[in-house]
Curated annotation (Swiss-Prot):
It holds the Pfam family Ribosomal_S10. Involved in the binding of tRNA to the ribosomes. One of its GO terms (molecular function) is tRNA binding. Belongs to the universal ribosomal protein uS10 family. This is Small ribosomal subunit protein uS10. Keywords: Ribonucleoprotein, Ribosomal protein.
Length: 102
């Protein structure tokens, strides 16, 4: 029988917030006795938006804005019921998007 694995994918706009959240998850999982692989930094997604500075004309004058999405991947190998329960109770910041796959 194959070993069970939980894959957690984190996304955030601020790299400090996502790193602290990943650290919290890793500490919680290691306390419960499961093995952790990660956090693995995935490529940062960079969206660039080009906007005309003037409200009417002057198309040559433009301004660029960028939005970076940082991503991390954490694998939990052989999770126990205690591990799953502690992950459900974990309090993480609102700026972090969490995707969990079993």
């Amino acid at each position: 029988m194959a070993a069970q694995k939980i894959r957690i994918r984190l996304k955030a706009y601020d790299h400090e917030v996502i790193d602290s959240s990943a650290r919290k998850i890793v500490e919680t999982v290691t306390r419960t006795g499961a093995q952790v692989a990660g956090p693995v930094p995935l490529p940062t997604e960079k969206n660039i938006y080009c906007v005309i500075r003037s409200p009417h004309k002057y198309k040559d004058s433009r301004e660029h804005f960028e939005m970076r999405t940082h991503k991390r991947l954490i694998d939990i190998l052989d999770p126990t019921p205690k591990t799953v329960d502690s992950l459900m109770r974990l309090d993480l910041p609102a700026g972090v998007d969490i995707e969990i796959k079993l």
